[in-house]
From Swiss-Prot:
EC numbers: 3.2.1.21
Protein name: Beta-glucosidase 5
Gene that encodes it: BGLU5
Organism from which the protein derives: Oryza sativa subsp. japonica (Rice)
Enzyme kind, highest EC tier: hydrolase
Species classification: Eukaryota, Viridiplantae, Streptophyta, Embryophyta, Tracheophyta
Positions of a beta-D-glucoside binding: Q46, Y336, E405, W447, E454, Y455, Y463
Length: 513
């Protein structure tokens, strides 16, 4: 049972992107609406480093990684050293012709004690970044929370497992709105509540590393995998609603800004046309996507979740339902790949999220059934992004959609990343198709601008448009082929790539096979 659950969970969280996506550009920047923005993204813990500098307190991820729980016992103590190199990166953003940049704020850097006194040096750091972006005409998108919580709040009341976090998160957001809102009009409250809660409170694979036997991927000392993922998401949704209400009442009129949330998505194809596999595909989206979005649009969880999870799924009071309902100005989605889904009988006895969803995942239709080894690679499927966008539009009406993360991860950190160029070309092309079909998509962000510490693999996977040499303490950047292509595309032309460089990229790709 535990082995099967581990395989299913790994299939969900450890599918790392490899392989080229055949694509021809066939479009230019000018084919997209003028108000559509193209950008790139990083996050505070994964990018900044400076973990104990200028008043920053430890986050849950500092504690987690310092316990040696990541591959190679890696940490983000320095990461890409964005705390010291942001000015250089701003220049690279200008060189890349970025139209927008999505960053997250470190709560531990802004309010080291989780509540109360604000750290002026933390404010100065983010003000300097924001000022630099605005000065160069780059639109600023801020994520308030991207998995890194002040450890003091974990110690005091178990973080997202306690309703006490609602007031602390609201107070933290209030500081950010007040200090940065005059220059920032695009806000995202929380990143990926769905996947974050599964990894943090079911498998124990993400900080704070809570789980219970027999469900954890790693050995956990505390946690309850059967209930904690649902409690954490419930509190995240209530916190989102509270912060949205604050923003709308106190700041939105003056700033004319918008606020939303980010949800992890993948397109799910039924493995067969059988009734049970078709139902499994729908159940997959109910548990993964609608778990977060349905309450924020319609005020309650999907009925299938209530039926299967039962009393382990928290319920909204009437007042809470009214608060969460309609608390989105836009939908933010992170999207990387598609999966094939088939039905798995609902287990008896104690269950966790993975058992509740009762689904098997495969990277392709020809993959063998899940066994002792989970698939670790999957080919790109740009059509899946288009289908996901259109599906969200059909489900939730004309809410604007921002694709806040999309990118290509590789264990080969070469600068000759032709596979990544092909991936980006094909996925951006799928967005254009969705737009022409009437989808209300407003922006697209490549993950990531520079190589960063990845939450699942540490430094084992590279996603950056710019390569970072993590073996060099100065963390030098080097433009990849993908950075040059993206820059050319944003200049409304296709980049001229030296044929010898393409040949080198092809040779490296063959050597990796």
């Amino acid at each position: 049972m535990a082995a099967a659950i581990a395989v299913v969970y790994l299939s969900l969280l450890l599918l790392l992107l490899h392989g080229a996506a055949p694509a021809v550009l066939g479009y230019t920047r000018g084919d997209f609406p003028e108000d559509f923005v193209f950008g790139s993204a990083t996050s505070s813990y994964q990018y900044e480093g400076g973990f104990d500098e200028d008043g920053r307190s430890p986050s849950n991820w500092d504690i987690f990684t310092h316990q040696g729980k990541m591959p190679g016992r890696s940490t983000a103590d320095v990461a890409a050293d964005g705390y010291h190199k942001y000015k250089d990166d701003l220049k690279l953003m200008v060189d890349t012709n970025l139209e927008a940049y999505r960053l997250s704020i470190s709560w531990s850097r802004i309010i080291p004690n989780g509540r109360g006194d604000v750290n002026p040096k933390g404010l100065q750091y983010y003000n300097d970044i924001i000022d630099g972006l605005v000065k160069n005409g780059i639109q600023v998108h801020i994520m308030l929370y991207q998995l890194d919580l002040p450890q003091v709040l974990e110690d005091e009341y178990d973080g997202w497992l306690s309703p006490r976090i609602l007031e602390d998160f609201k107070a933290y957001a209030d500081v950010c709105f007040k200090e940065f809102g005059d220059r920032v009009a695009h806000w995202i409250t929380i990143d990926e509540p769905n996947v974050a809660s599964i990894g943090s409170y079911d498998s124990g694979q993400l900080a704070p590393g809570r789980c219970s036997d027999p469900f954890g991927i790693r050995k956990c000392t505390v946690g309850n995998s059967s209930v904690e993922p649902y409690i954490a998401v419930h509190n995240m949704l209530l916190a989102h609603a509270s912060v949205t209400k604050l923003y709308r009442e106190k700041y939105q009129v003056a700033g004319k800004g918008i606020i939303g949330i980010s949800v992890y998505t993948f397109w799910a194809y039924p493995l067969t046309n059988s009734t049970v596999d078709l139902e499994a595909t729908k159940r997959c989206q109910d548990f993964i996507v609608h778990w977060v979005l349905r309450p924020l649009v319609f005020g309650d969880y999907p009925q299938v979740m209530k039926n299967i999870v039962g009393s382990r799924l928290p319920s909204f009071t009437k007042a809470q339902s009214e608060d969460v309902k309609g608390s989105l100005d836009f939908i933010g989605m992170n999207h990387y790949y598609s999966l094939y889904v088939n039905d798995r009988p609902l287990g008896k006895g104690t269950r966790d999220f993975v058992a509740d969803i009762s689904i098997y995942y495969r990277g392709s239709k020809t993959d063998p059934p899940p066994g002792k080894a989970a698939p670790t690679s999957i080919g790109p499927d740009p059509q899946g992004l288009r289908l996901m966008v259109q599906y969200l539009q059909e489900t939730y009406g004309n809410l604007p959609i921002y694709i806040l993360e999309n990118g290509y991860g590789s264990s080969n950190d070469t600068v000759h990343d032709n596979d990544r160029v092909d991936y980006l070309k094909s996925y951006i092309g799928s967005i254009l198709t969705a737009l022409r079909n009437g989808a209300n998509v407003k922006g697209y962000f490549v993950w990531s601008f520079v190589d960063v510490f990845e939450y699942l693999t540490g430094y084992g996977q590279s996603y950056g448009l710019y390569r970072v040499d993590f073996a060099d303490e100065s963390r030098p950047r080097q433009a990849r082929l993908s950075a040059r292509w993206y820059s050319g595309f944003l200049k409304n032309r296709e980049m001229d790539v030296d044929q010898s460089e393409l040949a080198m990229a092809a040779a490296e790709s063959r050597a990796q096979q």
